[in-house]
């Protein structure tokens, strides 16, 4: 009751001893119903899960969807305070154990509701060729990119609404050989294959769902700016561009073909997409 009173007048609230009087007032009843309707509209915009929601791109996605009144769950090694709910993954757990933990937490958070989108932007980078710790780098990249992508796919299979959207994160460089970062290229190529499989008939995803992978060149993140301060930032893709793109496809606007690998290339501060 106090909430409605505060909305009606910034200097007046309804006390509990006046509830009976106001509840029988036609004006109050109309205001009460309108307020409930507004709350329902805001809460029913949609539900999105961001895997990697604490990273730079993930945090940008969480913020963008939250700013547009979406319910957002974040899955990561640490919590994102902007999200509605957080699922913190144990980094020491095995692949199957991580999946089980995430699935149980998602089911509990949703309470029977469905997701409109599952967005996986978890990942990392490690260099190295066949001479330098190849297996170590490949193992790390597999955990960061492939584990998170397959767990996201399983979440989508169980909790995505029909017509929902799944986004994974590949790499434009992994369309070809990556001799100076073999482990990274292997992991991203696996994500590309997963995307094509999820976009095909019989993948196990809900009907009319869309799965794509974004393949950026370089994202404009604080960490990239720290380690490459002299780079041409005009060739880096803004995080807001990706977040807005995800929202558009979540809402069903101008969707690409299912299973598309979407190269994201920025030149002279202009970003263009190409589809494979």
Model-derived regions, located:
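Rossmann-fold scaffold of SDR-type NAD(P)-dependent oxidoreductases
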Residues: 51, 115-123, 145, 168, ...
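N-terminal Rossmann NAD(P)H-binding glycine-rich loop of SDR-like oxidoreductase domains
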Residues: 54, 58-63
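Catalytic loop of short-chain dehydrogenase/reductase
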Residues: 131-132, 158, 165-205, 215-218, ...
């Amino acid at each position: 009751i106090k909430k409605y009173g505060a909305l009606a007048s910034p200097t007046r609230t309804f006390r509990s001893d006046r509830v009976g009087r106001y509840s029988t007032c036609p004006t109050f009843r109309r205001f009460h119903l309108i307020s409930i309707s507004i709350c329902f509209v805001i809460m029913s915009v949609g539900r999105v899960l961001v895997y990697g929601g604490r990273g730079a791109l993930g945090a940008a996605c969480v913020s963008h969807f939250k700013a547009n009144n979406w319910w957002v769950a974040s899955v990561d090694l640490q919590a994102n305070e902007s999200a509605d709910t957080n699922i913190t993954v144990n980094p020491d757990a095995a692949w199957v154990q991580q999946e089980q933990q995430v699935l149980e937490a998602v089911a509990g958070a949703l309470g029977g509701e469905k997701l409109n989108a599952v967005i996986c932007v978890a990942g990392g980078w490690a260099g190295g060729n066949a001479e330098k710790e190849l297996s170590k780098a490949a193992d790390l990249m597999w955990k960061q990119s492939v584990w998170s992508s397959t767990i996201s796919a399983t979440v989508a299979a169980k909790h995505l609404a029909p017509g929902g959207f799944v986004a994974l994160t590949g790499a434009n460089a992994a369309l070809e050989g990556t001799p100076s970062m073999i482990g990274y290229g292997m992991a991203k190529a696996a994500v590309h294959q997963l995307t094509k499989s999820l976009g095909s008939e019989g993948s196990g995803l809900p009907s009319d769902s869309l799965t794509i992978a974004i393949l950026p060149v370089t994202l404009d993140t604080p960490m990239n700016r720290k380690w490459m301060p002299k780079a041409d930032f005009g060739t880096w893709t803004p995080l807001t561009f990706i977040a807005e793109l995800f929202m558009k496809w979540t809402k069903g606007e101008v969707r690409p073909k299912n299973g598309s690998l979407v190269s994201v290339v920025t030149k002279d501060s202009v970003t263009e997409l190409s589809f494979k």
